[in-house]
Regions:
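A short, Lys/Arg-rich alpha-helix, primarily the initiator
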Residues: 1-23
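Short, charged recognition helix plus adjacent turn
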Residues: 1-6, 62, 72-98
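Residues within the helices of the helix-turn-helix
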Residues: 17, 28, 58
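The alpha-helix within a helix-turn-helix
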Residues: 20, 31, 61
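Residue-level detection of the helix-turn-helix DNA-binding "recognition helix"
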Residues: 21, 35, 47-49, 76
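Short alpha-helical DNA-recognition segment
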Residues: 24-44
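DNA major-groove recognition helix of helix-turn-helix
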Residues: 45-46, 56
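DNA major-groove recognition helix of helix-turn-helix/homeodomain DNA-binding modules
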Residues: 55-70
């Protein structure tokens, strides 16, 4: 079965917060690093309201000295949902064959 991974935005945000604190950086430090006018984007990432762009994820990975995969958190329920979808599809498909 091919699994389509999805990102857990809330957990990824918490992970960005954890990595920022682990590296002893403030929100202001990240704001200055990215050249943002204000801190809103950083807070939105940390609160899991949105994800950084690919470019910003790459920059975070370099700043935190981790891989992008170490920043992103996969949603666990994705695997359960895909299994449920596969079973449901099989049941519906088999009912058409009979």
């Amino acid at each position: 079965m091919i699994e389509f991974p999805t990102i857990d935005i809330k957990s990824t945000g918490a992970n960005i917060l954890r990595l920022r604190k682990l590296n002893k950086l403030s929100v202001k430090d990240l704001q200055m690093y990215f050249g943002f006018e204000g801190p809103q984007a950083i807070y939105k990432w940390q609160w899991g309201q949105c994800l950084p762009s690919v470019d910003n994820l790459f920059a975070l990975s370099r700043l935190f000295n981790v891989t992008i995969e170490e920043i992103l958190v996969e949603r666990e329920s994705t695997k359960i949902f895909l299994l449920y979808t596969k079973i449901l599809f099989r049941v519906v498909f088999e009912s058409f064959i009979e």
